[in-house]
């Protein structure tokens, strides 16, 4: 052994072969807001809300309904209603092909899921948007499922809740899509005449034709923190009016300050808040909730 080898630290014995350990994909997640690296399981157990800065990540419609509804006694409404292509629409891709691709990628048939169930033993019909399905855009299927959900609430004398997350009307369906604004609003009029409450929950983002119709028609309008809510996006507005918009414009906190919504509720507290509101509206005995 040379004098140089004696000065160098001994080599670390490594087992033969490739011993490098790999970290499984999806084990960690980085918060888009505070950039904290979070253990995926911890994030899921915290309702997809960052435990460091309380940033609300976007979640799927089924995850949302799993958070809100009791585990027992659920049934899906309107799942047999499937999208079609009445206009034979084509942009860079045929609409019918875009639907098939999105259905395969997302695992849902359209952008709205409606379920009948309960929240803390209080009966309810709840709808939730799947934003990953073409930006949660509202087409004929979304409108029809929404209306069927409202009718189920009327038939069963329960409140109706809709959790919105949408970019607006689905351009590939043209006027068929825009007609859903009137169709859904008319259904909510029937719900109101039946003396039943409609609670609208706005999440990031709630825009376009959805915000211009049923999303803002709730007896109580709740928003998640920092949700983007409006008709046209802030960039489009700035380009149109040629002015710089105020800080926080179209965010939940801005809308609450200006009286456009009733309250902001953290996702982790949403189930309790909805149960309290429904108990009050329906005059359910306190022990039942």
Swiss-Prot record:
It is found in: Cytoplasm. Pathway: Lipid metabolism; malonyl-CoA biosynthesis; malonyl-CoA from acetyl-CoA: step 1/1. Its cofactor is Zn(2+). A zinc finger (C4-type) spans 31-53. Zn(2+) binds at residues 31, 34, 50, 53. InterPro entries: AcCoA_carboxyl_beta (IPR034733), Acetyl_CoA_COase_Trfase_b_su (IPR000438), ClpP/crotonase-like_dom_sf (IPR029045), COA_CT_N (IPR011762), Znf-ACC (IPR041010). Its EC number is 2.1.3.15. GO terms for molecular function: acetyl-CoA carboxylase activity; ATP binding; carboxyl- or carbamoyltransferase activity; zinc ion binding. One of its GO terms (cellular component) is acetate CoA-transferase complex. Acetyl-CoA carboxylase is a heterohexamer composed of biotin carboxyl carrier protein (AccB), biotin carboxylase (AccC) and two subunits each of ACCase subunit alpha (AccA) and ACCase subunit beta (AccD). This is Acetyl-coenzyme A carboxylase carboxyl transferase subunit beta. It comes from Methylobacillus flagellatus (strain ATCC 51484 / DSM 6875 / VKM B-1610 / KT). The gene is accD.
């Amino acid at each position: 052994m040379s004098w140089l080898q004696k000065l160098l630290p001994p080599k670390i014995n490594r087992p033969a072969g490739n011993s490098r350990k790999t970290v499984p994909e999806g084990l960690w997640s980085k918060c888009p807001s505070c950039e904290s690296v979070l253990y995926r399981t911890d994030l899921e157990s915290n309702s997809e809300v960052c435990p460091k800065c309380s940033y609300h990540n976007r979640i799927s419609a089924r995850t949302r309904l799993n958070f809100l509804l009791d585990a027992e006694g659920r049934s899906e409404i309107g799942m047999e209603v499937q999208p079609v292509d009445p206009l034979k629409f084509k942009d860079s891709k045929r609409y019918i092909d875009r639907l098939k691709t999105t259905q395969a990628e997302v695992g849902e048939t359209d952008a709205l899921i409606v379920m009948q169930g309960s929240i803390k033993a209080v009966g309810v019909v709840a709808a939730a948007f799947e934003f990953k399905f073409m930006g949660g855009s509202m087409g004929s299927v979304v409108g029809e499922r929404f209306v069927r959900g409202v009718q189920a609430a009327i038939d069963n004398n329960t409140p109706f809740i809709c959790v919105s997350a949408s970019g607006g009307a689905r351009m590939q369906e043209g006027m068929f899509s825009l007609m859903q604004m009137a169709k859904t609003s008319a259904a909510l009029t029937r719900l109101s005449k039946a003396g039943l409450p409609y609670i609208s929950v706005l999440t990031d983002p709630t825009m376009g034709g959805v915000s211009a119709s049923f999303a803002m028609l709730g007896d109580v309008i709740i928003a998640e923190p920092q949700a983007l809510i409006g008709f046209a996006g802030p960039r489009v507005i700035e380009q149109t009016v040629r002015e710089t918009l105020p800080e926080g414009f179209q965010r939940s906190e801005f809308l609450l300050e200006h009286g456009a919504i009733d309250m902001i509720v953290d996702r982790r507290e949403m189930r309790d808040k909805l149960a309290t509101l429904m108990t009050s509206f329906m005059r359910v005995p306190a022990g039942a909730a």
